[in-house]
């Protein structure tokens, strides 16, 4: 009986010893793995700290690059502006037609006058005005071809332009005539002439070929009468 109890105690102690040995061996084998994990975590933390320390440096470098680019562009713009050549601007044109398009720049304008009497044409001498009025008369007579083709609306602008020149030049020529001729020419011949031209203008605006032919014949007849009286 005593021997059996002694053998049982011996086996239990041996089992305890074997279990402790196993636990110690397992703890010994697990030790290096834990150390490796701790070291890996330390390395990751060090890398994160180094990357966070490098971020301000990269931002600082980017800012310095932007500043350098801005300074270079500013210096380039200054160089371009410094090389710009000034534009030479001449003085004002001389009075009464010193340059093209200024022939009537110094004429007085009376805005209270009717539009037909408000002229923007350079004054000419009576001789030059008589020559230009003959040219205007030829242009007015030449609108017959448009009337024959029933294209009366195509000459309205030219008819108005030539009528304006003719009115202005007739006034210049009539003003140079003796006093007893001025009034009769203005009232009888010249007045009727421009009324006939206005009627022709209106007929062309309406695109009425019969009326255009009628008023054209009246205008040409009156025009020839006026030119024959003025000479």
UniProtKB/Swiss-Prot annotation:
Keywords: Chloroplast, Membrane, Photosynthesis, Photosystem II, Plastid, Thylakoid, Transit peptide. It is found in: Plastid, Chloroplast thylakoid membrane. The keyword Thylakoid applies. It comes from the Eukaryota. The keyword Membrane applies. InterPro entries: PsbQ-like_dom_sf, PSII_PsbQ, PSII_PsbQ_pln. Belongs to the PsbQ family. This is Oxygen-evolving enhancer protein 3, chloroplastic. The gene is PSBQ.
């Amino acid at each position: 009986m005593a021997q059996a109890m002694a053998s049982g105690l011996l086996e239990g102690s041996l089992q305890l010893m074997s279990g402790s040995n196993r636990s110690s061996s397992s703890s010994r084998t697990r030790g290096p793995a834990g150390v490796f994990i701790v070291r890996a975590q330390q390395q990751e933390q060090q890398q994160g700290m180094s990357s966070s320390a490098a971020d301000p440096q990269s931002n600082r470098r980017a800012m310095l690059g932007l500043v350098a680019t801005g300074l270079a562009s500013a210096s380039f713009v200054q160089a371009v502006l410094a090389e710009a050549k000034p534009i030479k601007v001449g003085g004002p044109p001389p009075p009464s037609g010193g340059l093209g398009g200024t022939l009537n720049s110094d004429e007085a304008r009376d805005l209270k006058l009717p539009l037909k009497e408000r002229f923007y044409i350079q004054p000419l001498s009576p001789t030059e005005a008589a020559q230009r009025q003959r040219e205007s008369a030829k242009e007015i007579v030449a609108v017959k071809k448009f009337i024959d083709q029933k294209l009366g609306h195509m000459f309205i602008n030219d008819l108005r332009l030539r009528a304006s020149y003719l009115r202005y030049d007739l006034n210049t020529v009539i003003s140079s005539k003796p006093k007893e001729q001025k009034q009769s020419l203005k009232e009888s011949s010249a007045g009727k002439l421009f009324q006939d031209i206005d009627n022709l203008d209106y007929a062309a605006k309406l695109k009425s070929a019969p009326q255009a032919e009628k008023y054209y014949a009246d205008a040409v007849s009156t025009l020839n009468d006026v030119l024959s009286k003025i000479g």
